[in-house]
């Protein structure tokens, strides 16, 4: 099952947001801004093909009437505000996997981009900021590829990392390279194994893609029946690479329910359950695509009552601690969670518009997560200071209660 997940083609449904400084920088010429974004995404897509990832632009949001958040040269608060806005506003308007803020502001120091690491599919953290630096779009595209790489679990390259170019995409300094290093590929693989983000398994609808249609870019767009890439590289006998139409007699060219150009018979499982909270999906016999992922109702007990189902998963603090600090880690003692009452530094429940709010006593297990590494009595309250160090939504925080919006609420609360 894990190998099947790792081998599957991934799809990142991307929204790019241009801030108001971008609007003024290009003298309110929205056509030029959209053209620049399309050019950036074309290169971004090309870069990620080597990772078996298709990047599809499904939305462009241009802040013509002023910024929706406080955009400043300080990257950390700006990224946090952008993530909050994405969760509360953008996701409610447009289904997507990741959002990148393209800003005309000069970011602090030599910084031209910033993103959370290992955060793909997370409502608040699957975001990045990219400065529109340089006259050509090539370096901006490489910068966005770098920040997206962080979201996909890649860290900065070390001196020992190599690729086919003099420098690689995840170099700590800006590089014109289109190549990922061996370290980046290993980082990404480890991230997929440990986090298995599910949203990137879903292929975008052809009607969702907003960039101009191109036959030969591996993305199924309006007017196409298939797209197996450029003519010189297509290896799919079911698809005519020159026309992006199915070959004679073919019902399909790809998909979890497509085999040798024909629909797989009804009843064959195409998506096994990933946890006891998930439900298996089967082919219908009428489509190449696996039906929409379904799961058991939120709030159903799981893992021997250690947790409650939430969107197909069973989030518990123990597994979150292991993901952060590795095997041999457990949840810290209850007293550690009282740090979340402070409302200072990294110890809080909520952060909004650069302000942090302490947890109420009953909500301390919905703020920062605290873990203990086996036999380490020197640091009994370990924590991760980034946003992925917060307790996950849907996690059990008390008997009959789960974390929702950083509050410990009744498990049956909508």
Curated annotation (Swiss-Prot):
Does the entry feature the keyword Metal-binding, yes or no?
yes
SUPFAM superfamilies for the chain: Blood coagulation inhibitor (disintegrin), Metalloproteases ('zincins'), catalytic domain
Binding site residues for Zn(2+)? 146, 150, 156
Annotated binding of Ca(2+) 2, by residue: 278, 281, 293-294
Q: Where is the Disintegrin domain?
A: 212-298
Q: Which residues form the Peptidase M12B domain?
A: 10-204
Give the active-site positions: 147
- Where does it reside? Secreted
What GO molecular function annotation could you give as one example from this UniProt entry?
toxin activity
Q: What is its EC number?
A: 3.4.24.-
Q: Where is this motif: D/ECD-tripeptide?
A: 276-278
Q: Which InterPro entries match?
A: ADAM_Cys-rich, Disintegrin_CS, Disintegrin_dom, Disintegrin_dom_sf, MetalloPept_cat_dom_sf, Peptidase_M12B, Reprolysin_adamalysin
Gene Ontology process terms (BP): apoptotic process; proteolysis
What top-level branch of life does the organism fall under? Eukaryota
**Tissue and organ distribution:** Expressed by the venom gland.
Q: Which residues are glycosylated?
A: 7, 70
Single GO cellular component annotation? plasma membrane
Q: Which Cys-Cys disulfides exist here? A: 121-199, 161-183, 163-168, 215-244, 226-239, 228-234, 238-261, 252-258, 257-283, 270-290, 277-309, 302-314, 321-371, 336-381, 349-359, 366-403, 397-408
> What are the entry keywords?
Apoptosis, Calcium, Cell adhesion impairing toxin, Disulfide bond, Fibrinogenolytic toxin, Glycoprotein, Hemorrhagic toxin, Hemostasis impairing toxin, Hydrolase, Metal-binding, Metalloprotease, Protease, Secreted, Toxin, Zinc
Q: How is the cofactor bound?
A: Binds 1 zinc ion per subunit.
Which cofactor does the UniProt annotation name? Zn(2+)
Q: Where does Ca(2+) 1 bind?
A: 214, 217, 221, 224, 227
Quote the subunit structure annotation.
Monomer.
Its function, per the record, reads:
Snake venom zinc metalloprotease that induces apoptosis in vascular endothelial cells (VEC), without degrading the extracellular matrix (it cannot cleave collagen) or inhibiting adhesion of VEC. Has also fibrinogenolytic and hemorrhagic activities.
Task: Give the family, as the similarity comment puts it.
Answer: Belongs to the venom metalloproteinase (M12B) family. P-III subfamily. P-IIIa sub-subfamily.
Q: What's the protein called, per UniProt?
A: Zinc metalloproteinase-disintegrin-like batroxstatin-3
């Amino acid at each position: 099952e894990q190998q099947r997940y790792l081998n599957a083609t991934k799809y990142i449904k991307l929204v790019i947001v241009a801030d108001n400084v971008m609007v003024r920088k290009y003298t309110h010429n929205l056509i030029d801004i959209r053209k620049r974004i399309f050019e950036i995404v074309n290169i971004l897509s090309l870069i990620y093909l080597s990772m078996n990832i298709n990047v599809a632009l499904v939305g462009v949001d241009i802040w013509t009437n002023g910024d929706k958040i406080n955009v400043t040269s300080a990257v950390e608060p700006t990224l946090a505000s952008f993530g909050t806005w994405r969760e509360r506003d953008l996701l409610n308007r447009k289904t997507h996997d990741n959002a990148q803020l393209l800003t005309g502001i000069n970011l602090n120091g030599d910084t031209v981009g910033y993103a959370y690491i290992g955060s793909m599919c997370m409502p608040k953290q699957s975001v990045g900021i990219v400065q529109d630096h340089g006259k050509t779009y090539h370096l901006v595209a490489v910068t966005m590829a770098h920040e997206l790489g962080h979201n996909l679990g890649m860290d900065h390259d070390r001196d020992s990392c190599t690729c086919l170019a003099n420098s690689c995409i995840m170099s700590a300094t800006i590089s014109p390279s289109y190549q990922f290093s061996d370290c980046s590929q290993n980082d990404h693989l480890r991230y997929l194994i440990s986090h298995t983000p599910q949203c990137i398994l879903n292929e975008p609808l052809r009607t969702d893609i907003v960039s101009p249609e191109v036959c030969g870019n591996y993305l199924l767009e309006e007017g196409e029946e298939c797209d197996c890439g450029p003519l010189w590289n297509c290896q799919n006998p079911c698809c005519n690479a020159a026309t992006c139409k199915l070959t004679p007699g073919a019902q399909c060219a790809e998909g979890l329910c497509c085999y040798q150009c024909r629909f797989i018979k009804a009843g064959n499982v195409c998506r096994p359950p990933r946890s006891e909270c998930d439900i298996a999906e089967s082919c219908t016999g009428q489509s190449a695509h696996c039906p929409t992922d379904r799961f058991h109702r939120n709030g159903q007990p799981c893992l021997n009552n250690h947790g409650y189902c939430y969107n197909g998963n069973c989030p518990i603090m123990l597994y979150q601690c292991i993901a952060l600090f590795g095997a041999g880690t457990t949840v810290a003692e209850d007293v550690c969670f009282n740090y979340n009452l402070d409302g200072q530094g990294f110890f809080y429940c909520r952060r909004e518009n650069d302000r942090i709010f302490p947890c109420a006593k009953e909500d301390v297990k919905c703020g920062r997560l605290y873990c203990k590494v086996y036999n380490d009595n020197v640091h009994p309250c370990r924590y991760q200071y980034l946003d992925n160090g917060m307790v996950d939504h849907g996690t059990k925080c008390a008997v009959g209660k789960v974390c929702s919006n950083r509050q410990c609420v009744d498990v049956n609360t909508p």
